[in-house]
């Protein structure tokens, strides 16, 4: 086999002096002529399928076998014997299958005389199929994918418009499933996903034009969604096999048929069928069964020639073992006979495992014989430059769970040629003797990273970081390694790691500026307890400026994560690791085709469709901000890469980090919008982060001032100091951005109230200090801390007090005798302990707010009395005593006018309003007694009690219960409700007609309550094992509580109707 090698970076026109972009090419002997052959194939790459090709240099001694070998070697193909090379004329149906032993130069001389070179197309195809080829190809993934692409292309170009609509839909949906293996089965139900498929990818890639033109867009969308569901659970390989299974009855891709005649004359017209299962067979008509002629193992020799008559037909003779005479086949032309001979010869070589041809070609007088095939020297073998190196091999030495292989094809991306090349990198070339290699400080994708010193004329001892490449003897690995440097050389930004230079000779080095504090993730973990919130927001802001700069340069980074950010100083971080960065020439998006990618950081469209844009970088930046706020915790801990997209599709997002300002988390959630068009751009993120950072700095300064004031506050043991206590600062005002939906951060809202002083009671005219200094502050924080901000007895600071001088313990001692002072302190201590016990008791009886809008009111004496507090919570039988939160015990000497305040301003209600919903626990439903009626044989009362008991039982069991137990619990509540409603239906006839309407409304309300409970149960089951599960469990409890309350309301309505009967029956 003569030497040939790949050069994917050559332009597609033949050239005699073309060079590799990052290498000078293979050494050639003087006088040798090398040309380039462009060969199209079906190895999937980054470009459109019509452009999948490789450029191969060849010399005078290169044969077809050498061309095939070089292409398949670069893809690690096992079934090399199945491949053949086809030459076809673009403007006619002329096709030639090229025998492996023929020289490429001879072929070009022969055929390019009849047509120009640009009209010929060289195409690598799988032609020779082994028996059971599907099973055999499943062990050779590149060959399986190649054959699938070949068959799919033939189907789309030849018969797709003639097949049944159902088959076309199935085959198209199988191709979608295969192409986007990470996509969830229900992903196309989302409008944004379908639009990506329809507009960005294009439906014509999957479905024939006849189908797209004949079906309305809305109908087509429903058909695609319905059909896709059938194959939702298939993986890539299963999709391919299913494709073959559906297609085989309508298109025989596993055999070739030729119209010819058996014998040396046109006596028997047949269709000769050649394939792995049939061997060599023929059919006399379409409906007949094939007649077997011979197996490939029986063929001994093959000869072909042209007839000597005026028609110049092709004659094919096969010598069959055991046959008395050769099998003669007459073909319409010599070309067809030659193609048949090549096909049978390929099968014979495949089944016998021989490399020698079975074709006998007698040399005619004057015909130039092919030169002998020189053996490939060992040094040439090692010098051959493969087309590409599998990315999985590159990552094998440094593989982590952060990255996962998402597809099976290769990435043939190359940077824009106008700015990339070693010729232009000359300015960055550094002499190796100027670099002093130091200790290893980390590991990279291609090799180790070392600390070192660069002796430059400007700086004789510059500390640098040096990336080394372990296996850069291969030009393709060397090119990929240098690609990061050639990307970085375009950037000049204070928060992007700067490229110092490169050494392109082996061993290849990339020299960059050294960030002494290392990776941001490790830095955050080590400094977790010393970094404040402002520093974390500062890092996020600095990264946003770097990414806004990349966005303006039309680059996508594709690997934004804390591990790829370096810390230059405690207040400066820099974005690094541009190994996955890509330039978007068309300013739309970049589609990845191979590589290990960080799934847990990626946007859904990147996982589903391998689609990378600035918007997908925004998603990753949101995840990176979350990492920073979590001090280096990785996202989706404990979740498999394959499960991440499912959680995102279900609406799950990373939770808000502790101490994260709501404004910042709101910004993160905007970055995680499922629809890429709804995500902010980096310029917007930069501006908003700048505002959030300034607000945090102001709040930090305010907290520091507060802290300093607390430190200088007059202590009880002031040592005789007469200085007055500091005047408290003014209450905080809302942020000017609050109108845009920004709120104070939770850690600030939960800070102790600095405007309040723990007080002591009033006696003998001494003002009480138990109140709030500034009552107005309660209006700002009432929903968070309304107990602390309840209306005070007497305002703490009054003008008269400011003028009266200090009021410390020494002044009190002058007013009160010593024994009274001690008594006062003891009483205060007792009151504090009493308050603590009361608060703990209050928490135990804490309940969610009773809905006041449920429509049930009590008609007492003709007045409408709205429910308040716990009046409408039913008390079950067996607990006759009213069990409600106890009133706070009065303090000795404390004024009692608080009891006259409205219910909604009471301390108890205010305290309950401030309780976090996640602190709500299953509770007793304990209402006050109902109407004073005789309950003997009262079926309604008994069934209401039974329903409430069922709700209580469900509430107590729901938290630890697995999802499969939800249905029996809810079913128990439903049965109790059905019994109650049946009893009410029996009771209605004896009640006044004027009350029927109200009773029926109460019944309908109970039915809607049960429907709501069932709906929440379904959601809790659907989102099991996600962060939303607990939320829906709480909503189940709320719905159950509402059902119990409304059942009690129904009983109240019936009791009121009964009281009307009693009142009318009494004599006036």
Swiss-Prot record:
Identify the taxonomic lineage of the organism of origin: Eukaryota, Metazoa, Chordata, Craniata, Vertebrata
> Region (Disordered): which ranges?
1-26, 699-750, 869-912
> Which CDD domains does this one have?
FERM_B-lobe (cd14473), FERM_C_FAK1 (cd13190), PTKc_FAK (cd05056)
Q: Which gene encodes it?
A: ptk2
- The entry's protein name is Focal adhesion kinase 1
Q: Does the keyword Nucleotide-binding apply?
A: yes
Query: Domain Protein kinase: where?
Result: 435-693
InterPro entries recorded for this chain?
A: Band_41_domain, FADK_N, FAK1-like_FERM_C, FAK1/PYK2_FERM_C, FERM/acyl-CoA-bd_prot_sf, FERM_2, FERM_central, FERM_domain
Pfam families of this UniProt entry?
Answer: FERM_C_FAK1, FERM_M, FERM_N_2, Focal_AT, PK_Tyr_Ser-Thr
Q: Which GO terms describe its biological process?
A: positive regulation of cell population proliferation; regulation of cellular component organization; signal complex assembly
Q: What is its EC number?
A: 2.7.10.2
Which GO terms label this protein's molecular function in UniProt?
ATP binding; non-membrane spanning protein tyrosine kinase activity
What does its PTM field state? Phosphorylated on tyrosine residues; phosphorylated kinase is first detected during gastrulation, suggesting that tyrosine phosphorylation is developmentally regulated.
Cite the active-site annotation: 559 (proton acceptor)
Q: What does this protein do?
A: Non-receptor protein-tyrosine kinase implicated in signaling pathways involved in cell motility, proliferation and apoptosis. Activated by tyrosine-phosphorylation in response to either integrin clustering induced by cell adhesion or antibody cross-linking, or via G-protein coupled receptor (GPCR) occupancy by ligands such as bombesin or lysophosphatidic acid, or via LDL receptor occupancy.
